[in-house]
From Swiss-Prot:
It comes from the Bacteria. Keywords: Iron, Oxidoreductase. It catalyses: 2 Fe(III)-[cytochrome c3] + H2 = 2 Fe(II)-[cytochrome c3] + 2 H(+). This is Cytochrome c3 hydrogenase large chain. GO terms for molecular function: cytochrome-c3 hydrogenase activity. It comes from Acidithiobacillus ferrooxidans. Its EC number is 1.12.2.1. Disulfide bonds: none annotated. The gene is hoxG.
Length: 122
């Protein structure tokens, strides 16, 4: 049995208005690398007040390449939603059948796919 390591990097705070994706991804990327390093091959779940991230860190693969940004239900009024960051494994991750791709954004030349909450949580 593999031990699961958890690192609390709260508080991240809420993201209201325009999502500064580059800053958030860089924050999580740095937190992952600082805690686990780049070659440990760990699956490292990170949780914060409004965000989660889980990426497989192996060899020279950049953790940023394994992220999905997903909308989270907001308890505040308005059109802007806070966001979750959840794992995305390009070699085999399949969204729920009843879900549809919401949109895609590009962060530093990397396309980060955004899915609705219903697609990742049933």
């Amino acid at each position: 049995x593999t031990a699961v390591q958890t690192l609390d990097i709260s508080p991240v705070g809420r993201v209201e208005g325009d999502l500064d994706s580059x800053s958030i991804l860089e924050y999580f990327r740095n937190a992952i690398l600082a805690r686990f390093g780049g070659g440990l091959g760990k699956y490292a779940p990170f949780t914060g007040t409004n965000y989660e991230i889980g990426v497989t860190i192996s060899g020279d693969k950049d953790p940023q390449a394994g992220l999905v940004v997903t909308p989270r239900e907001s308890t505040t009024x308005g059109l802007n939603e806070p966001f979750y960051i959840k794992p995305y494994v390009s070699x085999g991750y399949i969204p729920h059948e009843d879900g549809a791709l919401a949109h895609x954004i590009e962060v530093d030349g990397v396309v980060v796919e955004a899915y609705t909450q219903a697609e990742l949580f049933r």
